[in-house]
Amino acid sequence: MKISEEEVRHVAKLARLNLTDEEVAMFSRQVGDILDYVDQLNTVDTEGVEGASHAISVNNAFREDKVKDSMDPDLALSNAPEREDTDIIVPKVI
């Protein structure tokens, strides 16, 4: 599958990348080769194969939630350089 140099330039622009003409040509060839390789999956007979989200079966081991005592807020905030009630005061970043 061929990807045009114009498509590479478009994706580079979306990603805010400045590519040289040589890089555009190189990425066009490389992405085309990758897409050709992935396209080989279309030749595989998948008749009767059940879809899967993992290569091996995965089972989640859930447990019941248990309420536990938490750390005392004064102890948790004891190393905070600046605080107000149970909140840590931080410099404004915006």
From Swiss-Prot:
Allows the formation of correctly charged Asn-tRNA(Asn) or Gln-tRNA(Gln) through the transamidation of misacylated Asp-tRNA(Asn) or Glu-tRNA(Gln) in organisms which lack either or both of asparaginyl-tRNA or glutaminyl-tRNA synthetases. The reaction takes place in the presence of glutamine and ATP through an activated phospho-Asp-tRNA(Asn) or phospho-Glu-tRNA(Gln). It is an enzyme of class 6 (ligase). This is Aspartyl/glutamyl-tRNA(Asn/Gln) amidotransferase subunit C. Its EC number is 6.3.5.-. The lineage of its organism: Bacteria, Pseudomonadati, Thermodesulfobacteriota, Desulfobacteria, Desulfobacterales. Belongs to the GatC family. Keywords: ATP-binding, Ligase, Nucleotide-binding, Protein biosynthesis. It catalyses: L-glutamyl-tRNA(Gln) + L-glutamine + ATP + H2O = L-glutaminyl-tRNA(Gln) + L-glutamate + ADP + phosphate + H(+); L-aspartyl-tRNA(Asn) + L-glutamine + ATP + H2O = L-asparaginyl-tRNA(Asn) + L-glutamate + ADP + phosphate + 2 H(+). PANTHER family: GLUTAMYL-TRNA(GLN) AMIDOTRANSFERASE SUBUNIT C, MITOCHONDRIAL (PTHR15004:SF0). GO terms for biological process: glutaminyl-tRNAGln biosynthesis via transamidation; regulation of translational fidelity; translation. One of its GO terms (molecular function) is glutaminyl-tRNA synthase (glutamine-hydrolyzing) activity. Heterotrimer of A, B and C subunits. InterPro entries: Asp/Glu-ADT_sf_sub_c (IPR036113), GatC (IPR003837).
